[in-house]
Amino acid sequence: MKQCTRQCILIIDFGSQYTQLLLRRIRELGIYAKVCDWNISQDLLVSLNPNGIIFSGGPDSVTNKHSSSISKVVFKIGVPILGICYGMQILVSQCGGNIRSVSNKGEFGYAQVEILSQKNTLIGNLYDYINDQGHCVLEVWMSHKDIVETMPQGFTVIGITENQQIAIIINEKCRWYGIQFHPEVTHTKKGKDILKRFAVDICRCEVTWKPVYIVKNIIKTIKKVVGQDRVVLAFSGGIDSLVTALLLKYAINHEQFVCVFVNNGLLCCNEINRISNFCKKYQDLNIIHLSEEKRFLSALTGVIDPEEKRKIIGKIFVEIFQAQISQLKNIKWLAQGTIYSDVIESGMSCASANIIKSHHNVGGFPSSVNIQLLEPIKDLFKDEVRNIGLYLGLPLNVVNQYPCPGPGMAIRILGEVREEYCNILRRVDYIFMEELNKSDLYNTVDQAFAVFLPVQSVGVQGDQRKYKWVIVLRAIETEDFMTAQWVRLPYTFLNKVSNRIVNEVEEVSRVVYDISCKPPATIEWE
């Protein structure tokens, strides 16, 4: 199997809640990192050709005979390995040491690790303070109930906890390292320094995960795999598809590339204006506009189940693109703005080492439609896509535009979707967005939108009681849309928005604010 020559740290995931955070911490260093499941195949491991490997934490215990383990091949490819928490226990166990479960002596939360020797490549001269005994100490974050009972041959204990449990081990000859704490969380003050020491100093990774290099590599890859073939892009107007369109524009000839934008009647507030402005700026792009509002809204009549709504919308999109591919002739590739969080949530975080997947049955396409899927930005998180957008010249207000979900307002209108509900929601959303901008709050929030509830609440207009619709406002802050916190918007701001909505949108009598985090709630309501 052909090897990938790109500089890479491979994170082998054992189910830790912090794996995606660990990935981000490595990328923040300017180093490309990728996550794969613990049962990674030998062929895929070799093809990725990593500079170094990190074993993540995880909920298992290596003392359980059914626990996750790792192929012995990983230890034979000659690259540095860093085991974190459960990953350290995997390292110890599979190198011949012994792990013991001590449920009453587990270590959780904030802890101090005493450094026994500074003469090592991983944490030499890294510490937070010197204790009364003159020993260097690291302040760290732990979450484990198993401990190292016997050390494997060739390893040295470098750090211990207050409970005299082994916390840092090193095999300098093999360049294998284990730490019982989590360097990826902010509670471990020197965590980022430790990860940098491993990735840069030990693994010798070059700092190349920057927009200029990312764009260069993506364009090079598109040129190589597409060649002279024709490509159609499913163009939604969101930041992901905007960036994908520009990358294709710079990678292949104008005649090879067509964008298809479908107005399904479910577009979020200002989507049409944003797309129109983009088209005016990049007039050399071939963008086909299709008005299919009635087709989508008609198909959604009477449908209340959110999954059924998604399926209907997806099915119609497939039918539309199938027809377009047939009309445009000689289309070999369907391009999409899939990003890394989409890949993770689909359970395919390491399904391929490349940005290309060949399919004869993509997204519900009939097997007779021979089309391949092109996903140029599937290795990027949302914030990385935005940085690429800025690098490619997109205006800041476009780059920071809140994302609109694929099904659009269909999943922001609970229950049946009607045209009148869409119009109400757009007017409400416009007020919400306008006030966020006026109050200089827009760029302090990562996502904000309104939700239409199919329930009526009593209100008073003039001297009359009337039952009208209820609207939910939602605003969240997040780094990667994998987890999210609700935003504490000022009460005066919420009061102003609420007053405007109930006064300017006569169909609404009540406005409520969503204070749910993800998890357990999702960002969208459906």
From Swiss-Prot:
SS bonds (residue pairs): none
Pfam families xrefs: GATase, GMP_synt_C, NAD_synthase
EC number(s) from the headed UniProt entry: 6.3.5.2
CDD domains listed in its UniProt record: GATase1_GMP_Synthase, GMP_synthase_C
UniProt keyword annotation of Nucleotide-binding present: yes
GO cellular component: cytosol
Pathway: Purine metabolism; GMP biosynthesis; GMP from XMP (L-Gln route): step 1/1
Domain of life: Bacteria
Binding site for ATP: S236, G237, G238, I239, D240, S241, L242
Glutamine amidotransferase type-1 domain ranges (all copies): 8-208
Task performed by this protein: Catalyzes the synthesis of GMP from XMP.
Name of the molecule in the record: GMP synthase [glutamine-hydrolyzing]
Protein species of origin: Blochmanniella floridana
